[in-house]
Amino acid sequence: MNISPYRTRIKFCGMTRVGDVRLASELGVDAVGLIFASGSSRLLTVSAACAIRRTVAPMVNVVALFQNNSADEIHTVVRTVRPTLLQFHGEEEDAFCRTFNVPYLKAIPMAGAEAKRICTRTLYLKYPNAAGFIFDSHLKGGTGQTFDWSRLPIDLQHPFLLAGGITPENVFDAIAATVPWGVDVSSGIELQPGIKDGDKMRQFVEEVRRADGRRLFGVA
């Protein structure tokens, strides 16, 4: 696994309110995630997503999350919401993911026995065009459950985000243990699904910066 000499990127996922997105931008978050997966408690309509999209600050990535959505649904989101990244949590194959001419991230579930068989070479063969990977506890995401970080593939050359039960209380240790390119949080900064907590958002960012300070400069 690569040891990044750079700061840890931060993605806040499951955003549903304009005010939460504005605060995320003010805190210096690198990306916000908008969910279009059917059945999610954080599901957005296209019109609601467009309203949120208009409030996103420059230099902040907008990530559209899908899980086994139809190509037509994804094309509509790409055309109207204009995400800078796509994120796939279902059974989508590489050929499908790259159909939309937008860089994509592939989520890899890590909680079950299937995770024991994941290896770096397999990921590269299955998703050769992925911009990066998200290692989450479950396929659906947003469960608030962690997984055994020692299961992460070794010698991974692509950027990867650590997700699954990441909170302000454990993100410092998570970064120290796995040195991810980025961390992805949803339920860990919420009052309830889709409703973010400003204090938790601030604390999460502070803990990531503290972890980077320790890792890069040896300061707490």
Swiss-Prot record:
Enzyme Commission (EC) number: 5.3.1.24
Annotated catalysed reactions: N-(5-phospho-beta-D-ribosyl)anthranilate = 1-(2-carboxyphenylamino)-1-deoxy-D-ribulose 5-phosphate
Name the Pfam families on file: PRAI (PF00697)
Q: Which UniProt keywords apply?
A: Amino-acid biosynthesis, Aromatic amino acid biosynthesis, Isomerase, Tryptophan biosynthesis
- Give the pathway listed in the UniProt entry for this protein: Amino-acid biosynthesis; L-tryptophan biosynthesis; L-tryptophan from chorismate: step 3/5
Molecular function in Gene Ontology: phosphoribosylanthranilate isomerase activity
Spell out the Gene3D superfamilies in the cross-references: Aldolase class I
NCBIfam families documented for this protein: PRK01222.1-2 (NF002296)
The protein here is known as N-(5'-phosphoribosyl)anthranilate isomerase
Q: What is the lineage of its organism?
A: Bacteria, Pseudomonadati, Pseudomonadota, Gammaproteobacteria, Lysobacterales
